[in-house]
Regions:
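N-terminal subdomain of lithium-sensitive/metallo-dependent phosphomonoesterases centered on the IMPase/IPPase/PAP
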Residues: 1-79
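Residue-level signal for inorganic ion chemistry
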Residues: 12, 37, 48, 82, ...
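Generic detector of well-ordered alpha-helical packing
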Residues: 38, 61, 78-81, 112, ...
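DPxDG-like acidic metal-binding loop motif
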Residues: 68-127
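A structural micro-motif at secondary-structure boundaries
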Residues: 128-132
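An extended, acidic
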Residues: 134-196, 202
Length: 206
């Protein structure tokens, strides 16, 4: 899983450099980013299939891919935070999760720009680049910093931020950088790796 994300990240970083140049072009970066999304997904599927060739897939771009093993799934979001990527904002992540019999066994969130690998595995905890994660211990919401999507940011009495990348928001909750996360529209490929990382840390997220 980690090797797959690292290999795919090379393509992401290269294309992100090109996206920044396309911001001022007449054609714009939209088609280019769509191709990047699909290419990264293709790399992840190929790499993950090398170690577990019979596992099935649930992906953002392709949808469900059934293989011989229909109890084990790789869940993939090639680029979470696509809008950020599209506009040349360096805040997005590659997300992978392993689901077995409808239970998440492990999850990964990789920020290729900052080279931060958030990884969690059942009964083994959650880590950032091999360092054990610790959530915030704050008890008062007045001292907390939360993150949300636009439609969920209706809490005027809270310190709220909107980063544009749900995966990193939840990873930041798990690592104590953020104190909570609110999101009202999320798909299975958006949440499974992040959810697993965060659940292991028992954060406040709704």
């Amino acid at each position: 899983m980690i090797k797959a994300a690292e290999k795919a990240s090379k393509s992401v970083i290269r294309d992100f450099g090109e996206v920044e140049k396309l911001q001022v072009s007449k054609k714009g970066p939209y088609d280019f980013v769509t191709k990047t999304d699909k290419n990264v997904e293709k790399i992840l599927i190929e790499e993950l299939s090398k170690s577990k060739k019979h596992y099935s897939f649930i992906t953002e771009e392709t949808g469900k891919i059934n293989n011989k093993d229909k109890e084990n799934f790789w869940i993939i979001d090639p680029i979470d935070g696509t809008t950020n990527f599209l506009h040349g904002i360096p805040h997005f992540a590659i997300c992978i999760a392993h689901m077995s019999n409808n239970e998440i066994i492990s999850g990964l969130i990789f920020d290729p720009i900052k080279d931060e690998m958030f990884f969690s595995e059942k009964n083994k905890g959650a880590y950032l680049n091999n360092q054990r994660l610790r959530v915030s211990k704050k008890n008062s919401t007045e001292d907390c910093l939360f993150s949300s999507n636009h439609e969920g940011a209706k809490f005027s009495d809270l310190n709220m931020r909107c980063s544009g990348c749900a995966a990193l928001d939840l990873a930041y909750v798990a690592s104590g950088r953020l104190d909570g996360f609110f999101h009202n529209k999320i798909n299975i490929w958006d949440v499974r790796s992040e959810e697993h990382t965060s659940e292991l840390q028992s954060p406040m997220y709704l």
